[in-house]
Amino acid sequence: MKLGLIGKKVGMTRIFTESGSSVPVTVLDVSKNRVVQIKTAERDGYSAIQLTQGYRRKNRITKALSGHFARAGVEAGKVIKEFRIEQQAINSDLKLGSEINVEIFLTGSKVDVSGVSIGKGYAGTIKRHNFSSSRASHGNSRSHNVPGSIGMAQDPGRVFPGKKMTGRLGGVNSTIQNIEVVRVDTVRGLIFLKGSVPGSKGNGVFIRPSVKHANKQ
Protein backbone atom coordinates (compact mmCIF):
# COMPACT_ATOMS: atom_id res chain seq x y z
CA MET A 1 0.00 0.00 0.00
CA LYS A 2 1.28 3.42 -0.99
CA LEU A 3 0.43 7.02 -0.28
CA GLY A 4 -2.23 8.70 -2.38
CA LEU A 5 -3.72 12.18 -2.70
CA ILE A 6 -7.04 13.95 -2.23
CA GLY A 7 -8.20 15.78 -5.33
CA LYS A 8 -11.04 17.84 -6.76
CA LYS A 9 -12.45 17.23 -10.22
CA VAL A 10 -11.92 20.35 -12.34
CA GLY A 11 -13.43 19.00 -15.56
CA MET A 12 -12.56 17.29 -18.83
CA THR A 13 -10.61 18.48 -21.85
CA ARG A 14 -8.29 16.99 -24.43
CA ILE A 15 -4.61 17.20 -25.16
CA PHE A 16 -2.65 16.32 -28.27
CA THR A 17 0.30 13.95 -28.33
CA GLU A 18 3.45 14.51 -30.37
CA SER A 19 2.01 12.26 -33.09
CA GLY A 20 -1.06 14.51 -33.33
CA SER A 21 -3.62 12.16 -31.81
CA SER A 22 -6.26 13.60 -29.46
CA VAL A 23 -6.47 12.16 -25.94
CA PRO A 24 -9.50 12.89 -23.70
CA VAL A 25 -8.33 13.71 -20.18
CA THR A 26 -9.83 14.56 -16.80
CA VAL A 27 -8.13 17.37 -14.88
CA LEU A 28 -7.83 16.93 -11.10
CA ASP A 29 -6.66 19.58 -8.65
CA VAL A 30 -4.50 17.85 -6.03
CA SER A 31 -2.82 20.93 -4.56
CA LYS A 32 -2.55 21.76 -0.85
CA ASN A 33 -2.57 18.18 0.49
CA ARG A 34 -1.43 18.54 4.10
CA VAL A 35 -0.46 15.87 6.64
CA VAL A 36 -2.82 15.91 9.62
CA GLN A 37 -1.81 12.71 11.42
CA ILE A 38 0.85 10.02 11.15
CA LYS A 39 -0.25 6.65 12.53
CA THR A 40 2.23 3.92 13.45
CA ALA A 41 1.79 0.24 14.19
CA GLU A 42 3.23 0.61 17.71
CA ARG A 43 0.83 3.35 18.80
CA ASP A 44 -2.28 2.85 16.63
CA GLY A 45 -2.10 -0.80 15.60
CA TYR A 46 -1.51 0.03 11.94
CA SER A 47 0.48 2.51 9.88
CA ALA A 48 -1.25 5.23 7.87
CA ILE A 49 -1.01 8.84 6.77
CA GLN A 50 -4.00 11.13 7.23
CA LEU A 51 -4.30 14.00 4.75
CA THR A 52 -6.60 16.97 4.32
CA GLN A 53 -7.28 19.19 1.33
CA GLY A 54 -9.09 22.47 0.78
CA TYR A 55 -10.05 25.01 3.43
CA ARG A 56 -13.02 25.42 5.73
CA ARG A 57 -13.97 28.17 8.16
CA LYS A 58 -13.50 27.37 11.85
CA ASN A 59 -17.17 27.96 12.65
CA ARG A 60 -18.07 25.25 10.13
CA ILE A 61 -16.28 22.37 11.87
CA THR A 62 -16.81 20.59 15.18
CA LYS A 63 -14.67 21.27 18.24
CA ALA A 64 -13.19 17.79 17.99
CA LEU A 65 -12.03 18.41 14.42
CA SER A 66 -10.83 21.88 15.34
CA GLY A 67 -8.59 20.40 18.03
CA HIS A 68 -7.43 17.69 15.63
CA PHE A 69 -6.27 20.27 13.09
CA ALA A 70 -4.75 22.47 15.81
CA ARG A 71 -2.58 19.61 17.12
CA ALA A 72 -1.21 19.11 13.63
CA GLY A 73 -0.67 22.84 13.17
CA VAL A 74 -2.58 22.95 9.88
CA GLU A 75 -5.50 25.03 8.70
CA ALA A 76 -8.89 23.29 8.76
CA GLY A 77 -9.53 21.39 5.54
CA LYS A 78 -12.67 20.39 3.68
CA VAL A 79 -11.88 16.70 3.23
CA ILE A 80 -9.96 14.26 5.43
CA LYS A 81 -8.71 10.95 4.05
CA GLU A 82 -6.51 8.26 5.55
CA PHE A 83 -4.15 6.24 3.35
CA ARG A 84 -2.79 2.96 4.71
CA ILE A 85 0.90 2.58 3.92
CA GLU A 86 3.75 0.31 4.93
CA GLN A 87 5.62 1.21 8.11
CA GLN A 88 8.96 1.45 6.29
CA ALA A 89 7.43 3.96 3.85
CA ILE A 90 7.10 6.55 6.63
CA ASN A 91 10.34 8.53 6.39
CA SER A 92 11.76 11.28 8.56
CA ASP A 93 10.86 13.98 6.00
CA LEU A 94 7.16 13.27 6.52
CA LYS A 95 5.99 15.50 9.38
CA LEU A 96 2.74 17.00 10.61
CA GLY A 97 1.75 19.99 8.49
CA SER A 98 4.03 19.11 5.58
CA GLU A 99 2.53 19.28 2.09
CA ILE A 100 2.37 16.29 -0.24
CA ASN A 101 2.48 17.42 -3.87
CA VAL A 102 1.60 15.83 -7.18
CA GLU A 103 5.20 14.74 -7.81
CA ILE A 104 4.50 11.39 -6.13
CA PHE A 105 2.78 10.41 -9.42
CA LEU A 106 4.84 10.11 -12.59
CA THR A 107 3.73 10.61 -16.18
CA GLY A 108 2.83 7.24 -17.69
CA SER A 109 2.09 5.56 -14.36
CA LYS A 110 -1.25 3.95 -13.48
CA VAL A 111 -3.59 5.08 -10.69
CA ASP A 112 -6.92 4.11 -9.13
CA VAL A 113 -9.47 6.91 -8.65
CA SER A 114 -12.40 6.69 -6.20
CA GLY A 115 -15.35 9.05 -5.93
CA VAL A 116 -19.13 9.33 -5.83
CA SER A 117 -20.67 8.72 -9.25
CA ILE A 118 -23.14 11.18 -10.77
CA GLY A 119 -26.68 10.52 -9.53
CA LYS A 120 -29.17 9.78 -12.32
CA GLY A 121 -32.29 9.50 -10.17
CA TYR A 122 -34.90 6.75 -10.48
CA ALA A 123 -34.15 4.73 -13.63
CA GLY A 124 -35.63 1.76 -15.43
CA THR A 125 -33.94 -1.57 -16.08
CA ILE A 126 -32.86 -0.59 -19.60
CA LYS A 127 -30.83 2.39 -18.41
CA ARG A 128 -29.83 0.89 -15.06
CA HIS A 129 -28.91 -2.69 -16.06
CA ASN A 130 -28.52 -2.44 -19.85
CA PHE A 131 -31.61 -4.56 -20.57
CA SER A 132 -32.93 -4.73 -24.15
CA SER A 133 -36.28 -3.33 -25.26
CA SER A 134 -38.95 -5.66 -26.58
CA ARG A 135 -40.43 -5.35 -30.04
CA ALA A 136 -42.04 -2.06 -30.98
CA SER A 137 -44.90 -3.85 -32.77
CA HIS A 138 -45.80 -7.31 -34.16
CA GLY A 139 -47.75 -8.67 -31.24
CA ASN A 140 -46.37 -6.35 -28.56
CA SER A 141 -48.91 -3.86 -27.29
CA ARG A 142 -47.96 -2.84 -23.73
CA SER A 143 -44.63 -4.53 -22.95
CA HIS A 144 -42.04 -2.49 -24.79
CA ASN A 145 -39.69 -1.55 -21.93
CA VAL A 146 -40.78 -3.85 -19.09
CA PRO A 147 -38.19 -6.02 -17.29
CA GLY A 148 -40.17 -9.24 -17.75
CA SER A 149 -40.66 -11.92 -15.12
CA ILE A 150 -39.17 -11.17 -11.71
CA GLY A 151 -39.86 -14.49 -9.97
CA MET A 152 -41.89 -17.67 -9.68
CA ALA A 153 -45.47 -18.13 -8.44
CA GLN A 154 -46.46 -19.84 -5.17
CA ASP A 155 -43.11 -21.55 -4.68
CA PRO A 156 -41.04 -19.68 -3.52
CA GLY A 157 -43.63 -16.91 -3.77
CA ARG A 158 -41.16 -14.07 -3.42
CA VAL A 159 -38.61 -12.03 -5.34
CA PHE A 160 -35.04 -13.06 -4.58
CA PRO A 161 -32.72 -10.39 -3.14
CA GLY A 162 -30.39 -8.85 -5.70
CA LYS A 163 -32.86 -9.17 -8.57
CA LYS A 164 -32.11 -6.57 -11.24
CA MET A 165 -35.04 -4.17 -11.12
CA THR A 166 -35.80 -0.47 -11.39
CA GLY A 167 -34.36 1.87 -8.77
CA ARG A 168 -31.99 4.71 -8.10
CA LEU A 169 -29.04 4.89 -10.45
CA GLY A 170 -25.70 6.46 -9.55
CA GLY A 171 -24.77 8.47 -6.50
CA VAL A 172 -22.69 5.62 -5.04
CA ASN A 173 -19.00 5.17 -4.23
CA SER A 174 -17.21 4.04 -7.36
CA THR A 175 -13.59 3.22 -8.22
CA ILE A 176 -11.99 3.13 -11.67
CA GLN A 177 -8.72 1.23 -11.81
CA ASN A 178 -5.63 1.42 -14.00
CA ILE A 179 -6.07 4.98 -15.26
CA GLU A 180 -3.02 6.34 -17.06
CA VAL A 181 -1.39 9.57 -15.91
CA VAL A 182 -0.99 11.61 -19.10
CA ARG A 183 0.52 14.78 -17.66
CA VAL A 184 1.57 16.23 -14.29
CA ASP A 185 1.56 19.99 -13.64
CA THR A 186 3.72 20.58 -10.56
CA VAL A 187 3.34 24.38 -10.71
CA ARG A 188 -0.46 24.43 -10.45
CA GLY A 189 -0.83 21.10 -8.65
CA LEU A 190 -2.83 19.47 -11.44
CA ILE A 191 -2.85 15.89 -12.70
CA PHE A 192 -4.23 14.90 -16.11
CA LEU A 193 -5.74 11.40 -16.30
CA LYS A 194 -6.71 9.57 -19.47
CA GLY A 195 -10.49 9.14 -19.79
CA SER A 196 -13.16 9.86 -17.20
CA VAL A 197 -13.34 9.51 -13.42
CA PRO A 198 -16.41 9.22 -11.13
CA GLY A 199 -18.33 12.34 -10.14
CA SER A 200 -19.22 15.73 -11.54
CA LYS A 201 -17.22 18.97 -11.58
CA GLY A 202 -16.15 20.05 -8.13
CA ASN A 203 -16.54 16.60 -6.59
CA GLY A 204 -13.84 15.26 -4.31
CA VAL A 205 -11.90 12.19 -5.43
CA PHE A 206 -9.13 10.02 -3.99
CA ILE A 207 -6.14 9.02 -6.12
CA ARG A 208 -3.91 6.06 -5.25
CA PRO A 209 -1.21 4.13 -7.11
CA SER A 210 -2.81 1.29 -9.07
CA VAL A 211 -3.16 -1.94 -7.11
CA LYS A 212 -3.39 -4.25 -10.12
CA HIS A 213 -0.50 -2.59 -11.94
CA ALA A 214 1.69 -2.91 -8.83
CA ASN A 215 0.86 -6.63 -8.55
CA LYS A 216 1.88 -7.21 -12.18
CA GLN A 217 5.26 -5.66 -11.50
From Swiss-Prot:
PROSITE patterns named among the record's database cross-references: RIBOSOMAL_L3
Gene3D superfamilies from the UniProt entry: 3.30.160.810, Translation factors (2.40.30.10)
Pfam annotation, one family: Ribosomal_L3
Domain of life: Bacteria
One GO-annotated biological process of the protein: translation
Modification(s) after translation: Methylated by PrmB.
Ranges of Low complexity composition bias in the record: 132-145
MF terms in GO: rRNA binding; structural constituent of ribosome
Coiled coil: none
Entries under InterPro entries matching the protein: Ribosomal_uL3, Ribosomal_uL3_bac/org-type, Ribosomal_uL3_CS, Transl_B-barrel_sf
Subunit field text: Part of the 50S ribosomal subunit. Forms a cluster with proteins L14 and L19.
HAMAP family: Ribosomal_uL3_B
Function of the molecule: One of the primary rRNA binding proteins, it binds directly near the 3'-end of the 23S rRNA, where it nucleates assembly of the 50S subunit.
Protein name: Large ribosomal subunit protein uL3
Organism encoding this protein: Nitrosomonas eutropha (strain DSM 101675 / C91 / Nm57)
Gene this chain is encoded by: rplC
